[in-house]
Protein backbone atom coordinates (compact mmCIF):
# COMPACT_ATOMS: atom_id res chain seq x y z
CA UNK A 1 0.00 0.00 0.00
CA UNK A 2 1.18 3.49 -0.79
CA UNK A 3 0.77 6.73 1.07
CA UNK A 4 2.35 10.17 0.87
CA UNK A 5 3.57 12.72 3.40
CA UNK A 6 3.73 16.24 2.00
CA UNK A 7 5.79 19.24 3.01
CA UNK A 8 3.01 21.74 2.30
CA UNK A 9 -0.51 22.06 1.06
CA UNK A 10 0.82 23.05 -2.37
CA UNK A 11 0.90 19.92 -4.51
CA UNK A 12 3.27 20.09 -7.45
CA UNK A 13 3.57 17.15 -9.81
CA UNK A 14 3.84 13.68 -8.37
CA UNK A 15 3.41 13.38 -4.63
CA UNK A 16 6.41 12.13 -2.68
CA UNK A 17 7.03 11.09 0.92
CA UNK A 18 8.72 13.92 2.81
CA UNK A 19 8.14 15.70 6.10
CA UNK A 20 7.76 19.25 7.36
CA UNK A 21 8.77 20.06 10.94
CA UNK A 22 5.69 19.71 13.12
CA UNK A 23 3.12 19.22 10.35
CA UNK A 24 2.47 16.31 8.03
CA UNK A 25 -0.02 15.94 5.19
CA UNK A 26 -0.77 12.29 4.48
CA UNK A 27 -2.75 10.47 1.81
CA UNK A 28 -4.56 7.25 2.83
CA UNK A 29 -2.86 3.90 3.27
CA UNK A 30 -6.22 2.17 2.61
CA UNK A 31 -9.81 3.00 1.70
CA UNK A 32 -12.89 1.04 0.66
CA UNK A 33 -16.71 1.00 0.66
CA UNK A 34 -19.03 -1.02 2.89
CA UNK A 35 -21.90 -2.03 0.59
CA UNK A 36 -25.10 -3.18 2.30
CA UNK A 37 -25.72 -6.73 1.08
CA UNK A 38 -27.28 -9.61 2.99
CA UNK A 39 -24.70 -12.03 1.61
CA UNK A 40 -21.70 -9.74 2.10
CA UNK A 41 -20.22 -10.35 -1.34
CA UNK A 42 -19.44 -6.86 -2.64
CA UNK A 43 -16.66 -4.32 -2.20
CA UNK A 44 -14.79 -1.46 -3.92
CA UNK A 45 -11.23 -2.00 -2.68
CA UNK A 46 -9.21 -0.82 -5.67
CA UNK A 47 -11.76 1.60 -7.10
CA UNK A 48 -10.97 5.27 -7.57
CA UNK A 49 -13.72 6.30 -5.16
CA UNK A 50 -15.79 5.31 -2.13
CA UNK A 51 -19.36 6.14 -1.10
CA UNK A 52 -21.38 7.31 1.92
CA UNK A 53 -25.17 7.50 2.19
CA UNK A 54 -28.13 5.60 0.73
CA UNK A 55 -28.56 4.87 -2.97
CA UNK A 56 -31.81 5.00 -4.96
CA UNK A 57 -34.24 2.27 -5.97
CA UNK A 58 -32.19 1.30 -9.02
CA UNK A 59 -29.27 0.52 -6.74
CA UNK A 60 -31.36 -1.50 -4.32
CA UNK A 61 -32.10 1.39 -1.91
CA UNK A 62 -29.18 0.16 0.19
CA UNK A 63 -26.59 1.84 2.40
CA UNK A 64 -22.99 2.75 1.56
CA UNK A 65 -20.29 3.58 4.13
CA UNK A 66 -16.76 4.67 3.40
CA UNK A 67 -13.69 3.30 5.17
CA UNK A 68 -10.45 5.26 5.31
CA UNK A 69 -7.17 4.79 7.16
CA UNK A 70 -3.88 6.74 7.30
CA UNK A 71 -0.38 5.52 8.16
CA UNK A 72 0.81 7.73 11.03
CA UNK A 73 4.19 6.08 11.57
CA UNK A 74 6.03 9.28 10.59
CA UNK A 75 4.87 10.81 13.89
CA UNK A 76 6.95 9.68 16.85
CA UNK A 77 4.82 7.90 19.48
CA UNK A 78 3.80 10.14 22.39
CA UNK A 79 4.14 13.31 20.35
CA UNK A 80 1.35 15.73 21.28
CA UNK A 81 -1.30 16.10 18.57
CA UNK A 82 -2.75 19.62 18.42
CA UNK A 83 -4.80 19.73 15.20
CA UNK A 84 -6.26 17.22 12.72
CA UNK A 85 -8.11 18.12 9.52
CA UNK A 86 -9.31 15.91 6.68
CA UNK A 87 -9.78 17.06 3.09
CA UNK A 88 -11.79 14.97 0.62
CA UNK A 89 -13.09 15.59 -2.89
CA UNK A 90 -16.75 14.82 -3.64
CA UNK A 91 -16.79 13.74 -7.29
CA UNK A 92 -20.50 12.84 -7.53
CA UNK A 93 -23.27 14.26 -5.38
CA UNK A 94 -26.50 12.61 -6.55
CA UNK A 95 -29.41 14.97 -5.94
CA UNK A 96 -27.00 17.70 -4.71
CA UNK A 97 -28.95 18.11 -1.48
CA UNK A 98 -26.93 19.05 1.58
CA UNK A 99 -26.12 15.92 3.57
CA UNK A 100 -24.08 15.44 6.76
CA UNK A 101 -21.00 13.28 6.22
CA UNK A 102 -19.53 12.10 9.51
CA UNK A 103 -16.36 10.34 10.63
CA UNK A 104 -16.61 7.59 13.25
CA UNK A 105 -13.65 5.68 14.64
CA UNK A 106 -13.43 2.01 13.66
CA UNK A 107 -12.93 -0.41 16.57
CA UNK A 108 -11.67 -3.32 14.46
CA UNK A 109 -9.24 -3.80 11.58
CA UNK A 110 -10.40 -4.17 7.99
CA UNK A 111 -8.95 -4.76 4.55
CA UNK A 112 -8.62 -3.34 1.07
CA UNK A 113 -8.45 -5.91 -1.72
CA UNK A 114 -8.25 -5.74 -5.50
CA UNK A 115 -11.97 -5.39 -6.34
CA UNK A 116 -12.67 -2.69 -8.93
CA UNK A 117 -16.19 -1.37 -9.42
CA UNK A 118 -17.39 1.16 -11.98
CA UNK A 119 -20.26 2.37 -9.84
CA UNK A 120 -21.77 2.35 -6.39
CA UNK A 121 -23.04 -1.21 -6.76
CA UNK A 122 -19.55 -2.51 -6.17
CA UNK A 123 -17.87 -5.59 -7.57
CA UNK A 124 -17.45 -9.11 -6.27
CA UNK A 125 -15.10 -8.89 -3.32
CA UNK A 126 -11.51 -10.05 -3.69
CA UNK A 127 -9.40 -11.68 -0.96
CA UNK A 128 -8.94 -9.37 2.06
CA UNK A 129 -11.56 -6.84 0.91
CA UNK A 130 -13.95 -5.61 3.55
CA UNK A 131 -17.63 -6.33 2.87
CA UNK A 132 -20.86 -5.70 4.78
CA UNK A 133 -20.23 -8.91 6.73
CA UNK A 134 -16.47 -9.54 6.52
CA UNK A 135 -13.53 -7.51 7.75
CA UNK A 136 -11.27 -9.51 5.43
CA UNK A 137 -13.16 -11.35 2.69
CA UNK A 138 -12.23 -15.00 2.35
CA UNK A 139 -11.28 -15.34 6.02
CA UNK A 140 -13.22 -16.03 9.22
CA UNK A 141 -12.69 -12.44 10.44
CA UNK A 142 -16.20 -10.99 10.47
CA UNK A 143 -17.75 -7.79 11.74
CA UNK A 144 -19.55 -8.20 15.06
CA UNK A 145 -22.22 -5.88 13.67
CA UNK A 146 -22.98 -6.17 9.92
CA UNK A 147 -21.92 -2.94 8.26
CA UNK A 148 -18.84 -2.39 10.41
CA UNK A 149 -17.78 -2.05 14.02
CA UNK A 150 -17.25 1.63 14.83
CA UNK A 151 -17.91 4.15 17.57
CA UNK A 152 -21.29 5.78 18.00
CA UNK A 153 -19.40 9.02 18.73
CA UNK A 154 -19.03 11.39 15.78
CA UNK A 155 -15.41 12.49 15.50
CA UNK A 156 -16.19 15.20 12.93
CA UNK A 157 -19.00 16.07 10.55
CA UNK A 158 -19.34 18.24 7.46
CA UNK A 159 -22.27 19.17 5.26
CA UNK A 160 -21.64 18.09 1.66
CA UNK A 161 -23.85 19.40 -1.12
CA UNK A 162 -22.46 19.35 -4.64
CA UNK A 163 -19.18 18.24 -6.17
CA UNK A 164 -16.00 19.87 -4.92
CA UNK A 165 -13.39 19.82 -2.20
CA UNK A 166 -14.50 19.69 1.45
CA UNK A 167 -12.56 19.97 4.70
CA UNK A 168 -13.52 18.38 8.01
CA UNK A 169 -12.19 20.87 10.55
CA UNK A 170 -10.22 19.82 13.59
CA UNK A 171 -12.25 18.76 16.62
CA UNK A 172 -11.23 17.51 20.07
CA UNK A 173 -12.43 14.03 19.08
CA UNK A 174 -10.40 13.96 15.84
CA UNK A 175 -7.35 15.00 17.85
CA UNK A 176 -8.09 12.30 20.44
CA UNK A 177 -8.48 9.66 17.72
CA UNK A 178 -5.13 10.45 16.11
CA UNK A 179 -3.41 10.79 19.49
CA UNK A 180 -4.56 7.30 20.43
CA UNK A 181 -3.32 5.86 17.13
CA UNK A 182 0.06 7.58 17.40
CA UNK A 183 0.57 6.28 20.92
CA UNK A 184 -0.66 2.76 20.06
CA UNK A 185 -0.25 2.18 16.29
CA UNK A 186 -1.75 -1.33 16.42
CA UNK A 187 -5.13 0.26 17.25
CA UNK A 188 -5.16 2.46 14.13
CA UNK A 189 -8.17 1.17 12.22
CA UNK A 190 -9.14 4.52 10.70
CA UNK A 191 -12.60 6.03 10.32
CA UNK A 192 -15.93 4.95 8.93
CA UNK A 193 -17.36 7.66 6.66
CA UNK A 194 -21.11 7.78 7.32
CA UNK A 195 -23.73 9.73 5.38
CA UNK A 196 -27.51 10.13 5.44
CA UNK A 197 -28.67 6.51 5.68
CA UNK A 198 -32.40 7.29 5.67
CA UNK A 199 -33.09 9.26 2.49
CA UNK A 200 -32.94 7.58 -0.92
CA UNK A 201 -30.35 9.04 -3.33
CA UNK A 202 -28.56 10.83 -0.51
CA UNK A 203 -25.30 9.05 -1.33
CA UNK A 204 -22.12 11.05 -1.98
CA UNK A 205 -19.07 9.75 -3.85
CA UNK A 206 -15.54 10.69 -2.77
CA UNK A 207 -12.34 10.16 -4.69
CA UNK A 208 -10.04 7.60 -3.10
CA UNK A 209 -6.29 7.10 -2.90
CA UNK A 210 -6.47 5.21 -6.22
CA UNK A 211 -7.80 8.21 -8.18
CA UNK A 212 -5.49 9.16 -11.06
CA UNK A 213 -5.31 12.89 -10.20
CA UNK A 214 -3.04 13.28 -7.14
CA UNK A 215 -4.64 16.50 -5.88
CA UNK A 216 -8.06 14.82 -5.63
CA UNK A 217 -6.93 12.17 -3.16
CA UNK A 218 -8.04 12.50 0.47
CA UNK A 219 -5.47 14.22 2.67
CA UNK A 220 -5.10 14.25 6.43
CA UNK A 221 -3.22 17.20 7.92
CA UNK A 222 -1.79 16.66 11.40
CA UNK A 223 -0.07 19.37 13.45
CA UNK A 224 1.84 18.11 16.46
CA UNK A 225 4.60 18.77 18.97
CA UNK A 226 7.25 16.04 18.69
CA UNK A 227 7.94 13.94 21.74
CA UNK A 228 11.27 14.81 23.39
CA UNK A 229 14.04 12.28 22.71
CA UNK A 230 14.11 9.42 25.21
CA UNK A 231 17.69 8.25 25.87
CA UNK A 232 16.34 4.83 26.87
CA UNK A 233 14.84 4.38 23.39
CA UNK A 234 18.03 3.07 21.80
CA UNK A 235 16.34 1.99 18.57
CA UNK A 236 14.39 5.28 18.16
CA UNK A 237 11.06 3.58 17.53
CA UNK A 238 9.23 5.59 20.18
CA UNK A 239 9.14 2.78 22.74
CA UNK A 240 11.41 1.24 25.36
CA UNK A 241 11.02 -2.43 24.62
CA UNK A 242 12.71 -5.72 23.77
CA UNK A 243 14.61 -4.19 20.86
CA UNK A 244 16.26 -1.70 23.22
CA UNK A 245 17.03 -4.44 25.72
CA UNK A 246 18.74 -6.44 22.99
CA UNK A 247 20.75 -3.38 21.97
CA UNK A 248 21.84 -2.78 25.57
CA UNK A 249 22.87 -6.38 26.13
CA UNK A 250 24.72 -6.38 22.82
CA UNK A 251 26.90 -3.51 24.03
CA UNK A 252 27.41 -4.80 27.56
CA UNK A 253 30.68 -3.69 29.12
CA UNK A 254 31.39 -1.06 26.47
CA UNK A 255 31.04 2.71 26.34
CA UNK A 256 27.99 3.18 24.14
CA UNK A 257 24.65 4.99 23.98
CA UNK A 258 23.34 2.41 26.45
CA UNK A 259 25.73 3.74 29.12
CA UNK A 260 22.98 5.95 30.53
CA UNK A 261 24.86 7.00 33.66
CA UNK A 262 28.12 7.72 31.79
CA UNK A 263 30.09 5.35 34.00
CA UNK A 264 32.29 4.31 31.09
CA UNK A 265 30.66 0.95 30.44
CA UNK A 266 27.20 -0.56 30.08
CA UNK A 267 26.45 -2.42 33.30
CA UNK A 268 23.72 -3.47 35.73
CA UNK A 269 22.86 0.12 36.62
CA UNK A 270 22.09 0.87 32.98
CA UNK A 271 20.01 -2.30 32.70
CA UNK A 272 18.02 -1.22 35.75
CA UNK A 273 17.45 2.23 34.24
CA UNK A 274 16.17 0.74 30.99
CA UNK A 275 13.79 -1.63 32.76
CA UNK A 276 12.45 1.19 34.93
CA UNK A 277 11.47 3.10 31.78
CA UNK A 278 9.98 0.09 29.99
CA UNK A 279 6.93 0.90 27.84
CA UNK A 280 6.62 -2.36 25.91
Task: For every predicted segment, state its role.
Residues 225-280:
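Cellulosome-associated attachment modules in secreted, modular CAZymes
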Residues 70, 80-92, 220:
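A short beta-strand element within beta-rich, extracytoplasmic domains
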Residues 28, 93-180:
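Beta-strand-rich interaction/scaffold domains
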Residues 1-9:
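Bacterial N-terminal signal peptides that target proteins for export
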Residues 21-74, 111, 197-200, 210-226:
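Flexible, small-residue-rich N-terminal segments that precede or flank a structured functional core
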Residues 78, 89-98, 199-201:
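Extended, low-complexity, turn-rich repeat/linker tracts enriched in Gly/Pro/Ser/Thr and Asp/Glu
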Amino acid sequence: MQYSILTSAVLVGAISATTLADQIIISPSADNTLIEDVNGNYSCGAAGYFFAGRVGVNGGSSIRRGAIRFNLSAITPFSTITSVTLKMYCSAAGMTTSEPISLKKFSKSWGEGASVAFGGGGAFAEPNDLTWLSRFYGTTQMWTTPGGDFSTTISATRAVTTTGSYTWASTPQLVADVQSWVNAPVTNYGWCVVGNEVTLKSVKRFDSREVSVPTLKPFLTVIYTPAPPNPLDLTHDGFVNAADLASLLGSWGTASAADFNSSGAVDAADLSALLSGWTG
